[in-house]
Amino acid sequence: MKKLFNLLKKGSKSSLIAAIVNFLLGSLKFLAYLFTGNVAMFAEMMHSFGDAANQLFVWVGSAVSRKAPNEKFPFGYGRLVNIVCLFAVIIVAILAYETILEGIHHIQHPSNADQNFNHFLINAGVLLIGIIMETFVLYKAGKEVLEEAHLPTTGLHPLTTSFANMNKAKPATKLVFLEDTVATSGGVIALIAIIISRLTGFGQIEGIVSVIIGLMMFYVVARVFLENAAGAIGVSDDEMELKASRIILENQYISDIKRLIVVKEGVDLHLEAIVETPHHDYSLRQLAEIKKDIATRLLQEPHVVDVNIEFMEEDTTQDWVDGKGSSIYKPYDTKGV
């Protein structure tokens, strides 16, 4: 039990916080929906419970993915977090569908605008509490995004610059950030809809907002699914590949890179390179020293956990060009050292 607890502590903190907050908000919105029957509140309730469920899955998955490699899984459990995220978005997709369906039904068969002032206060109050709490979670997730991107996290940066650096975050952090962006904006839209419905009597707006929130949820589903499907298969990291190539070519004993691949395993990066040396008379000891020097520098980079380097004799052809992407499909002569 202690071993399991220590493992769970390694999980994404933003996912755990988001799961707890969304469960509390979902329960609050459920009570508000029972009292008022408001459709926009129903959409928000479904969204909160969906977020709570999949963020709980993501928290557990991100923790288990940190397990050390073993004989059965020599490359570790890194891709497990991608698989968990794929499972999580299925839940979001189902809830998004139900939200849109309920919204369309309300548009086609609008009920009379609720003139009960107490109901209005309940709905507005619950949504306002939700916006405040979701903004707090969004701020925490944005801060985690910036920490993983090695950027300043002070002031309003988590709510501003985090959007531009979202792709540098871990899959679990990115999922929480995206979902809470939708949750916060959805809460604002739902609050506006309830106010408009109260002031104008236009009850259909609640159904329209329900559809909008459902479509926003589907956007999260599509984006998270595509990114994590690529991660589960094994996607290259072009930014790290470019950085690694410059580190390798800074070594005075390396003249060219024949092949370089950086593959993501969850948050971990595995690097494989075939490099050219200008002379063929290096001893095994010298090659081992060169390899050790390059590998040591590469392993200092964030998330790089494994480096494999092979040597070839220089072939007088310049193969590596910065920014050309992974060289995995480039043909190369197999005569190596």
Residue ranges with predicted function:
Residues 1-28:
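Topogenic membrane-insertion module of multi-pass membrane proteins
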Residues 2-6, 10, 72-80, 166-172:
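Cytosolic juxtamembrane amphipathic/interface segments immediately preceding
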Residues 7-17, 45-57, 83-99:
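Alpha-helical transmembrane segments of integral membrane proteins, especially early/N-terminal helices
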Residues 21, 30, 34-67, 104, ...:
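Acidic (Asp/Glu-rich) catalytic motifs at the cytosolic membrane interface
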Residues 35-45, 76-87:
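Alpha-helical transmembrane segments and their helix-start/interface "positive-inside/aromatic belt" motifs
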Residues 62-79, 109-113:
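Aspartate-rich (DDxxD/NDxxD/DxxxD) Mg2+/diphosphate-binding motifs
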Residues 81-337:
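Alpha-helical transmembrane segments and adjacent TM-loop junctions that form the membrane-embedded core
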